[in-house]
Amino acid sequence: MTYRDRPLGELAISIPRATRLFRQYELDFCCGGKLTLQRAAARHSLDLVMLESQLAELDSTPDQHRDWRQAPLDELCAFIVTRYHQRHRDQLPELVLMAQKVEQVHTGKTGCPRGLAKQLDSLRQELDSHMMKEERILFPLIEQGEGARCHGPISVMEHEHRDAGELLDVIRFLTDNMTPPTGACTTWRALYAGISELINDLMEHVSLENNLLFPRALGDV
């Protein structure tokens, strides 16, 4: 089977374990999910045949996760809220506190991520507002089958997804891609591990919405 002409977002949804592979090679399957594998590989100077081989191996391995492509939309919305929205609400306040501590204690050390707490708090505020709008406005419309009324709200949500992606780029830069310096304390290392987990969760969250929930709600798939 060839994968090169299929968009990254489609591959991320149809082969759930592909998201880990895409993160490994820094391929944006969320907001950049419309890019084909071939174009993404060329943009990042990656071996296309190697990528296709790895995807084929993943695709041939049975997956225990639910296939959300055929699930009722109300169940998909509920899953996103419980699996991702609640998780982000738990993750970000703790990460902000840890970042504040690291910046205060290690402010003079090489590699100290000065400004990280501010960026994480900005992300927290943006996501809090974003998720509330989804839960109070967009998801109820989707659950009621009001796809024709979803174009405007979905356009806003996709724009906010891109804004969140830009904040993640800043966070990656400040943390040297979540790489703690040699001799970093436990809190510092735990902070970067927590940020890595947050980014992985957020990318899966956005991919599920951009590449599956929103197109299905609009009747595009």
Swiss-Prot record:
Keyword GTP-binding: no
Key word Iron present: yes
Matching InterPro entries: FeS-repair_YftE (IPR023742), Hemerythrin-like (IPR012312), RIC_family (IPR019903)
Superkingdom per UniProt: Bacteria
Compartments reported by the entry: Cytoplasm
MF-aspect GO terms: metal ion binding
Annotated keywords: Cytoplasm, Iron, Metal-binding, Stress response
Main location: cytoplasm
HAMAP family per record: RIC_YtfE
Quaternary structure, from the entry: Homodimer.
Name of the protein: Iron-sulfur cluster repair protein YtfE
Gene that this sequence comes from: ytfE
